[in-house]
């Protein structure tokens, strides 16, 4: 079934990406395709080391012809991960993302508005500073940071950036280009009035939590619906030092009572027309990106690495994102109703099973007829 899964990556298209990134420059014998299949096997087969990747593939040597590879020596795979550009894997991810959007009827989100809705967040991936001395974050701690955009149509990642742990969320947020009318949901780590002013001038909406020490003046008070747990709905202008120059636009401050946690949440947005309860629901839906990070770390190999160089770590993270995209694509295509953890576990057990992959995806527990007569084995104990 692994070979059928790899048909999501046409070889001709893959080779074009190899040429674009010059991934096989000075390469001898070990192809970029073999490297990619090996690293994808690391994720889907849950291999913990180069030895397990090499040994796991070697134990299936007779079945690797269908994959177009041979089992690589661990030293060869380790060298390729250290020296071949990680940008190839980023390009594979973006290409697969387009294919997923084109081939799957994405499940519509619960909101009626037509604006594109994305969540923006980041997550630390801790590293041992003694082994990864390039990943300085704090004096005794190493880390890289995965910044992610999650599209709420289908809850697929739409873009990702991997940076050093020291890089701020706001710095990365400035790199993203959003289409006008897009609604960006983020947390207080992205509170930057210069960024909010930039987005507002470009016609991009944001929904976030307001800082407790924000200074503002109320321009207008809107009517509130207490039944929807809305306590206040105010049109405001920032009046703190420098804030009014960075973001001179009218904003909206909404106080919402969360009866589940019995706390008051204060939202800040530049969308002046949506209902206050809708703004609160939009922010609540941001938990999807936190769930994505949790699933990524729990089900794929992203907390321990098979290489120690920055290039090898990035290749493994991008491969994990590719694997996650495959799994979400399979969930959306399947009629079975897989949970992610069950899909990961059963797929790992059946990677080299001879069966129609898409039939298995819809009916994983179907008992197939045995196509030939079997003879009972007998032991001569005399």
Per-range role (PLM):
Residues 104-107:
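Active-site phosphate-binding and catalytic loops of NTP-dependent enzymes
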Residues 1-52, 56, 84, 91-95, ...:
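Single, function-defining residue in the core of a domain
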Residues 60, 64-68:
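Blade-loop segments of beta-propeller domains
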């Amino acid at each position: 079934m692994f070979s059928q899964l790899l048909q999501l990556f046409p070889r001709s298209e893959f080779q074009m990406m190899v040429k674009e990134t010059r991934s096989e420059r000075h390469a001898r014998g070990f192809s970029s395709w073999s490297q990619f299949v090996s690293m994808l096997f690391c994720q889907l087969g849950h291999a913990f080391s180069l030895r397990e990747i090499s040994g796991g593939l070697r134990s299936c040597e007779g079945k690797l012809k269908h994959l177009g590879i041979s089992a690589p020596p661990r030293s060869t795979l380790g060298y390729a991960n250290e020296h071949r550009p990680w940008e190839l894997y980023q390009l594979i991810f973006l290409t697969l993302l387009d294919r997923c959007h084109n081939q799957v009827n994405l499940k519509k989100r619960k909101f009626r508005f037509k604006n594109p809705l994305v969540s923006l967040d980041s997550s630390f991936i801790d590293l041992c500073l003694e082994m990864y001395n390039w990943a300085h974050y704090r004096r005794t701690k190493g880390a890289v940071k995965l910044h992610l955009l999650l599209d709420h149509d289908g809850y697929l990642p739409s873009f990702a950036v991997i940076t050093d742990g020291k890089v701020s969320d706001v710095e990365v947020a400035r790199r993203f280009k959003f289409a006008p009318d897009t609604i960006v949901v983020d947390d207080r780590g992205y509170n930057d009035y210069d960024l909010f002013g930039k987005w507002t001038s470009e016609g991009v909406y944001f929904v976030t939590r307001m800082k407790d020490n924000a200074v503002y003046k109320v321009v207008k008070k809107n009517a509130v619906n207490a039944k929807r747990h809305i306590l206040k709905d105010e049109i405001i202008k920032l009046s703190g030092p420098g804030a009014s120059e960075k973001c001179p636009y009218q904003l909206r401050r909404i106080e919402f009572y969360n009866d589940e946690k019995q706390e008051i949440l204060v939202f800040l947005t530049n969308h002046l027309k949506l209902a206050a309860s809708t703004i609160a629901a939009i922010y609540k839906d941001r938990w999807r990106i936190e769930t994505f990070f949790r699933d990524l770390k729990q089900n794929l190999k992203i907390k321990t690495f098979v290489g120690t160089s920055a290039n090898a770590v990035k290749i493994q993270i991008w491969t994990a994102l590719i694997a996650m995209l495959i799994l979400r694509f399979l969930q959306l295509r399947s009629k079975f109703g897989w949970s992610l953890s069950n899909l990961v576990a059963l797929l790992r057990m059946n990677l080299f099973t001879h069966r129609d992959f898409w039939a298995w995806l819809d009916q994983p527990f179907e008992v197939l007829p045995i196509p030939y007569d079997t003879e009972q084995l007998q032991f001569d104990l005399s």
